[in-house]
Structures are given as C-alpha cells and as structure tokens.
Amino acid sequence: SALPVDLTFVDAEDRVRFFSEGPDRVFARSKAVLGRLVQHCHPPKSVHIVDQILSDFRAGRQRVAEFWIELRGRFVHIRYFAVRNPAGQYLGTLEVTQDLTPLRALTGERRLLQYDTPAA
C-alpha cells in the first residue's frame, strides 16, 4: 500500500495472479479477479487490444505497451511490460498504473528536502 503505482501481474496463461492493494487504486480490484482470465477483467470494447498486447509480448514482437487516459478528472498512465526469465521465456505481463495528475501540476523546481506528508 506504500507504492505510488498500482501493480497487476498476469501469468503466461493470461490469468491474473497478483495485484497490489492500496487506498488510492486507479482501477478497483477484488480478490475475485485472482485466477480469472485477464480478458474477463476488461470492457468488451478493449479486449481486442488486450489480446494484441499479450500476443505481441508472447511472440517477442514488443516488450512494452503504454497508454494514457483522462479518467474521472485524473490523468492516468498505464504501462504493460513483458516479463521473461533469463532464458527469454515469456512468463507473463506486469501492468503498472499511476495517477499522474499531481505530477502534471508541478512547476518550478524543488532542490531542498521538504516532506509533504507526516511520518506514520
């Protein structure tokens, strides 16, 4: 829950095996998605894109797919990474999602240490 990004891992058989939990997840996840085909976790209109990414990763044609969208007034960055073992065998896909809205609002510079949140 301390990560500034949301992580979801889909295995080589296209099944959701892990997702990070946190109070500010961009896309809500419940434990019910674990073991489910990732295609069943996306709107029907985008399943063909999911299939294309997975096919390209599996075949080694691509390593990263990247999107950014406006969602409920937020600027959301979504990246997919092919995960491979040292021998190059495809193990699955890691989805990394981040709300970049606060970062897009930054201006100027901060060169000195300044904490914005209190210690836990």
For every predicted segment, state its role.
Residues 58:
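Short basic alpha-helical hairpin corresponding to helix-turn-helix/winged-helix-like nucleic-acid-binding
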Residues 1-55, 107-114, 119-120:
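PAS-family sensory domains
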Residues 61, 66-76, 91:
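Per-ARNT-Sim (PAS) sensory domains and their PAS-associated C-terminal
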Residues 100-101:
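PAS/PAC or PAS-like capping segment
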Residues 94-97:
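Sensory-domain boundary capping and coupling elements
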